[in-house]
Amino acid sequence: MRLKKTSQTTDLVLALFLYIPVVWAALLIAQSLGGGLPELLSNLTAALEQPFRIQWTDKSLLSILVCTGAYLMGLCLYASGQGRTRDGEEHGSAAWGSPRQLNAQFRQKQNKILTRHVRLGLDTHKHRRSLNVLVIGGSGAAKTRGYVKPNILEANSNYVITDPKMEVLTATGGYLKRQGYDIRVLNLVDLSQSDGYNPFRYLRDEKDALKLVNTLIQATTPKGSHESDPFWSKSETALLQAIILMLFQEAPEYEQNFSMVLRVLEYAEVKEDDDEYVSPLDLLFRAMEYENPESVALRQYKVFKQAAGKTAKSILVSAAVRLAPFNLPQIKAVTDHDDMDLYTLGERKCALYAVIPDNDTTFTFLVSLLYSQIFQTLYYCADQIHHGALPCHVHFILDEAPSVNLPGLPRELATMRSRNISCSTIIQNMAQIKELYKDSWETIPGNSDTLLYLGGNEASTHKYISEALGKSTIDTKTHGQTKGRSGSYSTNFQMSGRELLTPDEVRMLDNRYCILFIRGTRPVMDEKYELMEHPAIRYTMDGGGPPYIHRGTVEPPITGEPLFQIDFDNEKENAAA
């Protein structure tokens, strides 16, 4: 709209300027009407030599009115023709932009590195773009080397990093430590080098406990699985909510963990042929009922107890299988205490690495729980403590994002900008997010104002990039020849539309180059960033520095009174009496 107003103002000024020679010509015509064309030509020659020696006659006003009418008619004809044409853009106006001009528009003192010549400033109020970036690149397309590592070495944000294979941690952890960052690691590749992460530490009220169970169910459900009857998962959800809420409300802090949830499940005995059987867990909830009959935990447990004996046993088995990883001593050692201190992620310099294996997804549900609670905690701090944006910018770098089940990612991408949070979603191709997010997959590129394509070999991605580049108008030349006695030869010139890059040309993109889209600007093709050119490269393992080895923390000593002090034998006798 602003461009349209500017164009209209320019046209009006030009029309007024051109009206001056129209009036001059009208006065010249008026003083020559009596002598006809010969006198007009004579006066024209004299007027060109002395343009300001024109006399006013009794016919000057009429001449000005006639010439003005003709001038206005000509303007109307010109305007009507302009409204229906866009010369040179009949079939599309797509064109390549300049990397250096784009960089001049968006570069600031603190930036994200996008390509060799383009930076994106972290101050969103200046360029009015979100900092969310969708990075697409197949294996070997330099996603880690050309984007992940350079942006970590900028050390201008707090970071939450998904690190397949532990490559990024060993390469960049030492440099961030040198820059004063507090390094926290959830290491699922080598659990002995992991800090503790206990999801119970971030439960502030009953709503958080319910969210935790829902996230756990979603994260431990295999991708692509479809339940014919949701009864089982809902019943299992009610049972786990009851146990987790009970521990949250009644247990000492050292018993608030998932290994304790498994222990509580062991007390939930069910006998298929005896619906009146009272299990130790039943006794525990009866004791709770005396103290707090309106407890949400108690209500959820009563939902579970509505199931018959055989059905209840199946629900218990399903819940125990879902939580089986917490039986492992290594997982128990990590999840029984907490070192992540998620409340400070937006407060002071820190970097959190989630190291996941690239060939096994057994324990990646822990990363799903972690990320879900990070978003909840950061949103809480921004909204309730800082009443707006976090003091420190938090940059999520989700390398191989589809390998971690993040069902809330499309929603969070749409809401994180105002809280000083951004996300770099890194995928191999568009088919991955289409499979993972089904009908909502377009929300991810839609809420990422920057798209960086590094190359790949997947057909739907080639088509997507080609369509995003758009069509341009080109000149075409065709030749025709007719042979025979009256043969002829003809050449025709015309305009037609053509994609800026066709899908097969996108596939053939030189591995040294990438394609960059920033909302509201023309796409650019530029060289990928070269990691070895970064000023801090000498402090990393890639530049000859030592690898970073993270040392996990020791579980703190147990303090407080245990929850299970009930004499179950006496309670059973009292119940029978």
Give the positions of each predicted feature:
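Conserved ATP-driven motor cores of ASCE-family P-loop NTPases powering translocation/secretion/packaging/pilus
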Residues: 413-415, 419-515
